[in-house]
Amino acid sequence: MELTEKNYKEDFCAKKISVIIPMYNAEKYIKKTLNSIIEQSYQNWEIIIIENGSEDKSPDIIREYEKKYPEIRMIKGSGKGPGPARNKGLKLAKGDYIVFVDADDYLPDTEIFRKYISIAEPTGADIVVSNYVRLWEDKILPASKHEAFALCSPSSEEFRFRGFFSIGTLSYVWCKFYRSEFLKKQQISFSENSYAEDKLFNMQCYICDAKFAFLEDVGYVYRKNDASVSWQYRSDSTENWFKIAYELKGWIEKKQKEPEKYASLIRYLIFFASFFDAKMEYMQYKNSLRAVRKTLKKYGTNPVGKRVFHELADRKRHLYINQRMWEIMIRTFSFGMKQQWYILLAVGIKMLITQRVDERLSDTGVRE
């Protein structure tokens, strides 16, 4: 996007941007993260770092930055994960807009704040979404672009499916520019779930009819860090996903929204979660089909999971996703879950992983 004096008004500079960074053991990357913000051409910002009990030199590095930049402050967190840390940051934020950055990632474009605000202000968007790239061992790799769903109607199932699942860009809080007033008005905050709290956060924004705008430029570099919570095996992952499903259902009821309109969010959430957890079990337990079967059975016998797979397997229920490959995969997998063919599905998942087909389910899941 080319910036000109015509599409960028100087009075936009009065708008403050709050950058919230949860931090835990990030000494290797935090300088690059902070410098990518400090070097922004748009200078009306503050950085709030929530220190979550780091055992390395991360806090010492931040103290040096605090001495030099009064806009940077470090706050002690609870150590309970990124969700509570971001909530603390939201309470302290003074900005008109909110940007979330992970302590091991960075912003590749020094103009990105100007670009975000030049779209958010004239359009009144509650969330501006940019594209992003992935960093794997110092190698930049492209990610699926949001153009695949950005042109869909925001109220459509196609937008929800691509945005939150098959493409997934809407699931992450990074590469986003949030209007602070919208979050406060809708009382949106992060769950204390141990994982995927950002997916729930953004789904809550969507259910509250957030107005989206899209920026074609790359606004974020996502780094694969094996020490981060995103890449750690979690024995309670299945319980966590069902907790998210229950919280999502409760949020729909709280906001008095039409349940059936948003039910597909819960259905696809459980479908993708079951496959993801089965894959993690397979890799954790050294290619154990028994471990995969056990996980699939957890999903298939849970009351919510059981209902979801019955509904997705029902050919009378139309899937408005306009992607034949995905429809076949969802129908077939769900029918197998409905019939309790867990070991057969486990073999199928093994084949997908062996052929690396599973990587197509997530940009952040590609194995280099």
Language-model regions, residue ranges each:
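Membrane-interface aromatic/basic loop that binds lipid-linked glycans or pyrophosphate carriers
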Residues: 2, 283-368
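Cell-envelope/extracellular polymer assembly enzymes that use nucleotide-activated donors
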Residues: 15-18, 36, 46, 200
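Short, well-formed alpha-helical segments that are part of the catalytic scaffolds
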Residues: 25-39
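Acidic helix N-cap motif at the loop->helix transition within catalytic regions
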Residues: 28-31, 56-65
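A conserved acidic beta->alpha catalytic loop
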Residues: 43, 51-60
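Glycine-rich, basic loop-to-helix element that forms the pyrophosphate-binding segment
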Residues: 74-93, 103
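Short aromatic/hydrophobic "clamp" motif used to bind/position activated sugar donors
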Residues: 98
